[in-house]
Amino acid sequence: MSLEKVEWDYIILGAGTAGCVLANRLSAVKNNRVLLLEAGYSDRSIKIKVPALQPYVFGKKEFDWCYQAQPDKTRNNVRSIWPAGKVWGGGSSLNGMIYIRGQKDDFNEWKNFGVDGWNFEDVLKYFLKSENNEETNSNYHSQNGPLNISNLKSNHLLNEAFIDASANFGLPKNNDFNGISQTGVGKVQAFQKKGLRQNTSSAFLKPIIKRANLKVISGVLINKLIIKDSKVIGINIIDKNISKNFISKGEVILSAGSIGSPMILQRSGIGDASLLKKNDIKVEVNNKAVGENLQDHPGVYCEYPVNISTYNTEFKFNKIVKHGLNWLFNGSGPISTPAATCCAFFNTNKILDRPNAQVHFSPFSYHYSPLSKFHLPDYPAILTGTCILNPETKGRVNISSKDPQRPPIIEHSLWASEKDLTNMVKALKKLSQIMSSKPISKYILNNPTSKLNDIQIKDFIKSNSFLGYHASGTCCMGDKGVLNSNLKVKSIKNLRVIDASVMPKIIRGNTNATVIMIAEKGADYILRKR
């Protein structure tokens, strides 16, 4: 039978971080016929699998949509690139592999937006459901899930120096940012298994790819939903310039991410009526919240040249063979290193209060932006990336045309909020004090912000900013949002959104683990028909 004639129980749009989880859980019921559609292709590339090659994946159109935003007036009209996975595993195939869940109160506060059933006690079991933690099994961790989480497979003395300097500055040492408290400094855990990236494709999709009731189609462009009498009955795609329809007798689940999901809704007639009419699209549901509430963590890089060897010098040709063999046979060494080896979480006003800043620490430095080639300096250096965790700044995503091949209009100014900018100034001043503390200070040759006043630090911020690459919130749950608390699109039957876009407020930390949790909880809602 032609796939276009099959009546699918579930059609999942996007084989990304959430989509792979959903495909696994929904197809576990043998009577469910599940169709998974993806614009990209398999994640078989070695660039995805090898942690040290992550910069060669990020921002590459083979794997990444590379959406470009409108000029940012707060940064001299820079046009930021908003990465979004275009490959099996989505963002989990591109990201820095850092396993952070956020803070307990992040989820408890979602209730303030009219969201029920998502407090920390509600979501913890779904974090545990996916997790297979190599190192710990406690009330906060599990060793029974498909997703492997591991400690670092490589250490560098600068890791310990950073941790000790932070402790001397006043931060407690923290061996588990996903346990009792996030506050403090310590080494990260990573989405890795045997020194390889562990994305949701390798953990959830590939092990079940041969299930008879699951069909995965790659390389297709999602155009729009087919809606009749306020009910989704199918999906229209473009496959090699040919329009095709797939029929749904159950639910369609949007898992196209915080840029892709609102665009599909808008092209389908769900969104701000004025935008839809402007683009000659029939209005199915007038909801101005679609595409609004775009959030990310604004960040700033600082590079510190040092007087000892870092991975910059270890990756030179005379040493890379040794490290390559170590990784190949042991899954360890510098090649297994995630994007950061340590993190520090603190409050920019009172250091031990609820963290609103996160420092990513790496015993290597690199020069990179999504539009430029990755460059690893040949001198030894440290790189830190400091993010504001509770940003006030919000943007939006809108379609530029009903043509699915046209890019979106992304409006987001990284430093539109003076409070965010002030918090970053405070965060960098605290970081500068940490890097001036023993024992790490004896290795630092230049501390870039130590002699700058607040005005100069603001200029430094605007010249060294980056997106946290944690786009969230554009199809959010809540009273004023797009979805109800069960992830169903309001005023339309048989349609849910399950990805990072559902968060009413971005969590305080890296978002990948939370998206996997959302997918686990969403799958449970679907299977229980809630």
Model-derived segments and their meaning:
Residues 12, 16-21, 153, 258-259, ...:
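Residue-level detector of alpha-helix initiation sites
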Residues 7, 29-34, 119-120, 212-215, ...:
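Loop/turn elements at helix/coil->beta-strand transitions in domains of secreted/extracellular proteins
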Residues 2-8, 124, 130-179, 186-188, ...:
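FAD-dependent oxidoreductase catalytic-site/capping-region signature
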Residues 29, 33, 40-45, 225, ...:
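Glycine-rich loop(s) and the adjacent beta-strand/alpha-helix scaffold that form part
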Residues 2-128, 287, 297-306:
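N-terminal glycine-rich phosphate/pyrophosphate-binding loop and immediately adjacent elements
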Residues 111-232, 238, 301-324:
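Conserved redox-cofactor binding core of oxidoreductases
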